[in-house]
From Swiss-Prot:
Phosphoserine carried by residues: 276, 308, 318-319, 355, 364
Gene Ontology biological-process annotations: arachidonate secretion; phospholipid metabolic process
Highest taxon, organism lineage: Eukaryota
Full protein name: Protein PROCA1
């Protein structure tokens, strides 16, 4: 304890004995010399009745200082880290501001040089969200056993995720990228008829290229161009293989369905009946039927064999008649032959009938 007191006394005496030029005077301090992320904390203690023009009257950071002053007027709308406010509990390592205050700060830091350090870190690296207040009814009082006793409209914070914000540093980076692109030499591309190379050693052994055929050279600026082309080819191959597999599966399913349908139709279809023998009663006459009924079974078999033989002969004759009917010339010849053969017989008969009776010599 005694050591601590002596140390504190020594430090206090040293600070008091220092010259006045080196002492830090609050009246002569300039807000512009402080880093941009510390200004808000220092300006928070200043009364709101003071004029903004009194702070940072000159310098590059005039506009950001004014913006910080306006922004610190929103002190009532800040949710501090790991604190609960507006029915929300903040789990962020940084404070969450109201969206109106946040947008004002970003707009004022766009055209200023001081936004190069604070702007990108706050908007892109940290990605601090903002919130808006909406009135909702929430329970205010509770009973001892936990149920709500009374409700009241309370402003509830609705968190909004941050959007990409363009700062002065982004504009500088874009300008640098444009200058680098302009300084790069253009990539040579040849479109049109190819000229023959003067070196004969470099020519192909198979033959010289056609000079009339246009040649287009495609070059990818990115180093991963070849890998992307191979990936695309692999994807196309995989798609084709999948389509083939699907087609094979569909064909197999169709064959299975057809086999099942065939089995069902076989089960449902009735048994094929044997063709019934021709009715003998229709082909036979009444007399033959009577004979068959009276005669023995052996005689019936003989009669049936005779009838079948006669039927075959009739069938053969009918086929011959069909052949004759197919040829009209033969038919006419046969008709004429029949007519010529019938006429002399009729004439003979007529002569026999018309011949007068022979005269008897006795009567004369």
């Amino acid at each position: 304890m005694w050591v601590r007191t002596t140390l504190t006394i020594e430090r206090w005496t040293k600070e008091k004995t220092e010259p006045k030029a080196r002492s830090w005077d609050e009246a002569l301090s300039d807000v512009n010399r402080l880093p941009s992320w510390e200004r808000g904390h220092l300006l928070a203690g200043v009364a709101s009745s003071t004029d903004v023009s009194t702070f940072s009257e000159g310098g590059d950071c005039k506009e950001p200082d004014k913006c910080c002053w306006r922004h610190k007027q929103c002190t009532g709308h800040i949710i501090y880290p790991f604190a609960s406010d507006c029915v929300r509990h903040s789990l962020h390592l940084h404070s969450v501001n109201h969206c109106n205050c946040n947008s004002r700060l970003k707009d004022s830091s766009e055209d200023s040089s001081s936004s190069r350090g604070a702007g990108p870190t706050c908007s892109h690296v940290i990605e601090s969200p903002c919130f808006e207040l909406t009135p909702e009814e929430e329970h205010v009082e509770r009973f001892r056993y936990g149920w709500c006793k009374s409700y009241r409209p309370v402003s509830v914070a609705v968190i909004h995720h941050p959007l990409y914000h363009e700062c002065g540093a982004d504009d500088l980076n874009e300008e640098e990228e444009e200058e680098e692109e302009e300084s790069k030499p253009p990539i040579p591309t040849q479109v049109g008829p190819a000229t023959a190379s003067p070196d004969l050693g470099t020519s192909m052994a198979t033959g010289t290229p056609d000079s009339t055929a246009p040649i287009t050279i495609w070059r990818s600026e990115s180093p991963t161009g070849k890998g992307q082309g191979s990936k695309v080819i692999k994807k196309v191959k995989k798609k084709k293989e999948k389509e083939k597999d699907k087609e094979e599966m569909d064909e197999k399913a169709k064959l299975k369905k057809k086999a099942k349908k065939g089995q069902l139709t076989k089960k449902k279809s009735p048994v094929k009946l044997e063709p019934s023998p021709p009715d003998v009663s229709r082909s036979l006459s009444a007399r033959q039927l009577a004979r068959m009924s009276e005669s023995s079974p052996e005689s019936r078999e003989e009669l049936e064999s005779e009838d079948s033989y006669n039927g075959r002969g009739q069938g053969e004759l009918s086929s011959e008649d069909i052949v004759e009917s197919s040829s009209p010339r033969k038919r006419e010849n046969t008709v004429q032959a029949k007519k010529t053969g019938a006429k002399p017989s009729q004439a003979r008969k007529v002569n026999k009938r018309k011949s007068p009776p022979g005269s008897n010599p006795n009567l004369s």
